[in-house]
Regions:
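Membrane-embedded transmembrane alpha-helical bundles that form the catalytic cores
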Residues: 1-286
């Protein structure tokens, strides 16, 4: 890409790379979801039009293997391509360095999303772990493990799941407590994984940015997204929201850009209508 003299040539390489990355993500993670949506639409059209052939369309999911961490390393590869295109980092000299950046294991399961310009410079430095960093890394791993296994899993198995599975068996207050319990469960689960990833990386001589900053202390939705899953929200802002025009093209366009960003952010979390609605609600709130 950098060897191409033409500006349009470089853009073409970027577009091709994005199509490959997003195409693979779309196939592995969203193909069955799209087929299910299309089957439901066809069935409804058949019912409305009285077409029995459309009504008889059934959805059978394909057995597609979902690569571990595909949502995270796809965003990492996209950040590398765009940062090189924008001139924020120099292209890697060796392919093995790129493979190392994409496949570095601590964050692949649940983040944080590691950006090329933050991680790649660390590759060329000799990893040195001081006593303080070793203690900090070990503390983060243990805290993350405690959040995940002791708090999140316990709340899920012994409280939240029971209420969500049979809400009519419980009072309104108990259902409300179940909602708050789920909020605590999802925070401890997600931030626990992030803490462990950051701690393991630190023990190996690499530093990741903080991914959660007491999000439930936020006073507004905007502040919440500055504190919750920081690596994702900042990635969406820098590589999607700003690329769409951000707030530079008027109030209506700003609202549209926010809604698109949050819709895609919700879809990134999972292939289901509930995640799309969740993203839409946050987009409207922002």
């Amino acid at each position: 890409m950098t060897k191409t003299a033409s500006k349009w040539g470089r853009k073409a390489w970027v577009v091709l790379s994005l199509c490959v990355d997003l195409g693979l993500l779309g196939y592995f993670k969203y193909f069955n979801f799209l087929r299910e949506i299309m089957a439901a639409v066809a069935h409804e059209l058949g019912y409305q039009l009285g077409n029995t052939s459309l009504q008889n369309i059934t959805y059978q999911p394909l057995d597609i293997f979902l690569p571990v961490g595909i949502s995270f390393f796809t965003f990492q590869t996209i950040s590398y391509v765009i940062d090189v295109y924008r001139g924020r980092i120099a292209p890697l000299r060796r392919w093995i360095d790129y493979v190392f950046y994409v496949s570095f294991f601590p964050q692949l399961v649940a983040g944080p999303i590691v950006r090329a310009r933050d991680f790649i410079p660390q590759i060329y430095k000799t990893p040195v772990v001081t006593r303080a960093e070793f203690g900090e890394g070990l503390f983060l791993v243990l805290c993350g493990l405690f959040k995940k296994t002791v708090i999140s899993d316990y709340i899920s198995l012994n409280f939240v799941d029971r209420i969500f599975d049979a809400p009519l068996l419980y009072t309104g207050v108990e259902n409300l407590l179940g909602v708050y319990g789920y909020a605590l469960q999802i925070y401890c689960d997600f931030s626990g994984y992030s803490d462990m990833a950051i701690g393991i990386a630190l023990l190996l001589g690499f530093r990741f940015n903080v991914n959660f900053d007491s999000p439930y202390q936020s006073a507004t939705i905007t502040e919440f997204w500055r504190r919750w899953h920081i690596s994702l929200s900042s990635w969406l802002k820098d590589y999607l929201y700003i690329s769409l025009g951000g707030n530079r093209k008027g109030k209506i366009r700003t609202y549209i850009n926010l809604l698109i960003t949050m819709l895609l952010g919700g879809l990134w979390h999972g292939a289901s209508v509930s995640f799309i609605l969740w993203g839409a609600l946050h987009g409207v709130a922002l």
